[in-house]
Swiss-Prot record:
Compartments where found: Cell membrane
Gene name as annotated: ITR2
One GO CC annotation: plasma membrane
Coiled-coil zones: none
Assigned protein family: Belongs to the major facilitator superfamily. Sugar transporter (TC 2.A.1.1) family.
Name of protein: Myo-inositol transporter 2
Length: 555
């Protein structure tokens, strides 16, 4: 195999929009329509799958360095989880530390501060990820995590806490976009789901740690000190990741975009230490093949024209709608209200240590995210969603019925000083447990696979758009929750979430294709005609058939 793999052959006649790409830096030629059908470049046969991808993927073996790389990148997920989960335990401890007892509105604004910051962090750092690079975008997120935690811990007024939460949110939003994007671009196809899932698992793990520390502090630490320490502890993992980022490489795709092909090759060699030089050259060729489309689009179109292209070009639009919809519906389930307001809601139910009770959904979520990420590459993203989302519907139906009878004596409202029926409180907690199990297996980690659906030239921006949709939905839920409990009651509030879950299930059924077994650069083909539910299955069948034929021939 030649080591100078810098020419990509055109698709055979009969293929869609024949394309010739010469990758040489001096003479890059791509037909005008290339970025209209990017990622459908140069197959070596008449099927949908590039044989080179099959050959290269089957040489992948996970190395100790790659495990280190994933572990460091996944700290971003832990930070995300800790800093979103700690507010539920910390807010009840604030008491009069800021000069007065926090009102429901102030609690909602403080809680929503991180979400608002995350919207800006996701949109700004996400869209700049190609220019900054994945690595530097994560470093900026770490600085935001650190600064936000310090500001909050040193606060003596509500506005100061809100500012700190906004800054912290920039880090959360940036991490939510960049970490799964970075991991997905580096991970072998066969284990990509588990690798991205490792970051997704660290989110609920961070929430468990936050709930556990919060429960301990509520039980034995003076409140006026405890809430400051809880927020301040977020500095530790952000500084650790900031220091370890020095040892992580930039994404090879970004290095090729910058014309640093030798650095990209060295990066691939370091990640895939067991691969031969020929396989590394083949991997580099594949990266160059898809990067060519990106450079063409960025060169030929202005930022405004590219932004317009995301919505006028149907394959781009379908991909963005698919991932944005799933991310938004994941928030509209209402799960995060159990984290943000765990201390408040379980306190209203009469439990003395609300933070300790909040460990129930946090621990269960972490456990079932771990199970989900362990099987996602074998079972598939779509199949998990189709199979287990109905369990969430059943659970919230139970929740609604339980809340109806629980709050009947108080006119449908949860009142702080009322002694509710112990069996009915247990029924509510049981329904929440039942809800968290399918949520952990589905939305909790699958929403973070968004980069799998997006072709390279819109991957960073598309991830930013979908994650922004996620945080906008989160904002609506978190800001409105306490007010909804007052106006609609618990029964009406969870009835609303049940409606969103049902609509989300219909969306997944028609608009969320399977990406299991397909490389991150192949999946863009799914959306050429429609949302590609059947096409994705066809691509996987053809890929498996070709791989079987290829390796049977070798034997």
């Amino acid at each position: 195999m030649s080591s100078t793999l810098d020419t990509i052959t055109p698709m055979p006649e009969g293929g869609n929009n024949q394309t010739f790409v010469n990758i040489s830096k001096e003479d890059l030629k791509v037909e005008t329509e290339h970025y209209e059908n990017v990622a459908y470049i140069a197959n070596a046969h008449d099927g949908l799958i590039d044989e080179n991808l099959v050959r290269a993927e089957n040489e992948d073996k996970v190395t100790p360095y790659f495990m280190f790389l994933i572990s460091v990148a996944a700290i971003a997920g832990f930070l995300f989880g800790y800093d979103t989960g700690i507010v539920g335990a910390a807010l009840p401890m604030v008491g009069t530390s800021l000069g007065h007892t926090l009102s429901a509105t102030e609690s909602e604004i403080i809680t929503a501060g991180t979400t608002i910051g995350a919207i800006f962090g996701a949109s700004i750092l996400g869209t700049m990820a190609d220019k900054l690079g994945r690595k530097w975008a994560m470093i900026i997120s770490d600085f935001a995590f650190t600064a936000g935690a310090i500001i909050i811990a040193a606060s003596y007024s509500v506005p100061q806490i809100i500012v700190g939460r906004l800054v912290l949110g920039v880090g959360v939003g940036g991490a939510a976009v960049i970490a799964p994007l970075y991991i997905a671009e580096l991970a072998p196809t066969a284990v990509r789901g588990r690798c991205v899932g490792a970051n997704a698992f660290c989110i609920p793990f961070g929430q468990v740690v936050a709930s556990a520390i919060g429960a301990g502090f509520q039980a034995g630490v003076p409140y006026h000190i405890g809430w400051r320490v809880l927020f301040g502890l977020g500095v530790v993992p952000s500084v650790v990741q900031l220091c370890l980022m020095h040892f992580l490489p930039e994404s090879p795709r970004v290095l090729v975009l910058r014309g640093k092909e030798q650095e990209a090759r060295a990066c691939l060699k370091k990640i895939y230490g067991n691969a031969t030089d020929d396989i590394i050259d083949l991997k580099l060729r594949i990266v160059k093949q898809y990067v060519a489309a990106t450079t063409t689009m960025q060169r030929d179109l202005s930022f405004t024209e590219r932004a317009k292209k995301y919505w006028t070009h149907k394959p781009y639009r379908r991909a963005i709608i698919s991932v944005s919809g799933v991310q938004a519906f994941g928030q509209l389930t209402g799960f995060n209200t159990l984290l943000y307001y765990s201390g408040t809601i379980f306190g209203l139910l009469g439990l003395k240590n609300g933070a300790a009770a909040g460990l129930i959904p946090s621990c269960l979520n972490a456990l079932f995210v771990f199970i989900g990420m362990s099987i996602v590459d074998k079972v598939g993203r779509r199949k998990l969603m189709i199979t287990f989302i109905p369990g969430m519907m059943i659970a919230f139906t139970w929740t609604i019925i339980s809340f109806h009878f629980l709050t009947k004596p108080t006119g449908g409202l949860l009142l702080k000083d009322y002694q509710y029926s112990t069996p009915l409180v247990g029924s509510v907690l049981g329904s929440i447990v039942l809800f968290v199990i399918p949520f952990g297996l589905t939305y909790s980690h699958i929403i973070w696979y968004q980069s799998e659906f997006l072709p390279l030239e819109i991957r960073a921006a598309g991830s930013a758009i979908s994650t922004t949709a996620c945080w906008l939905a989160n904002l609506v839920v978190s800001v409105a929750y306490l007010t909804q409990l007052e106006k609609l009651g618990a029964t009406g509030t969870y009835g609303l979430y049940l409606g969103f879950i049902t609509i989300g299930y219909i969306f997944v059924y028609f608009c969320y294709p399977e990406t299991k077994g397909l490389s991150i650069d192949e999946t863009a083909e799914i959306f050429i005609d429609g949302f590609g539910i059947e096409k994705a299955h066809q691509m996987l069948r053809e890929k498996r058939a070709f791989a079987a034929e290829l390796y049977a021939g070798r034997a």
